[in-house]
């Protein structure tokens, strides 16, 4: 078995997950991945309250106090390739999540502009409102195209972490 001590901060859905993939250094100073069952003695979770953003999901601190993980729960990957692969996949997912939220905001803005009456006509008929809606839709479409392109690169195993970071940053 391996013994984990320490904590991991800002873990998305840490408070609801039944297990955690945890990356830690072993006695040889190599980074290893472990599958940690939530019921293991020495493993606890503290939810982080009063966040300024990302309120749609639970964010937690994972706490390990002499948590004994069976050797069979250690992943085969050694080094940073494993955690960075997980992080890149999460970043890619975040880019699509942001696009979904953006599209919902655009739909609300468009509907509002069609129903909000000012000077006896919908504000959607005003040129400045139309320009703002067009700019919103254009930015969303550009984000979708970027995320789609990165997804195709990922399918061919050609996506660089910079591509994925760009998709997250721009979306």
Model region roles, listed by residue range:
Residues 62-82:
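Long, acidic (Asp/Glu-rich), low-complexity accessory segments flanking structured domains
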Residues 1-2, 61-63, 85-171:
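Alpha-helical interface subdomain recognition
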Residues 5-45:
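A short core secondary-structure module
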Residues 39-68:
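Flexible, small-/acidic-enriched active-site or ligand-binding loops
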Residues 43-45, 52-54, 74-75, 83, ...:
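Short clusters of hydrophobic/aromatic residues that line enzyme substrate/ligand-binding pockets
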Residues 16-18, 56, 127, 163:
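Residue-level preference for beta-strand/loop junctions
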Residues 25, 53-55, 169:
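A general structural signal for short secondary-structure junctions and capping/turn motifs
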Residues 9-15, 54, 89-93:
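Glycine-rich phosphate/pyrophosphate-binding beta-alpha loops
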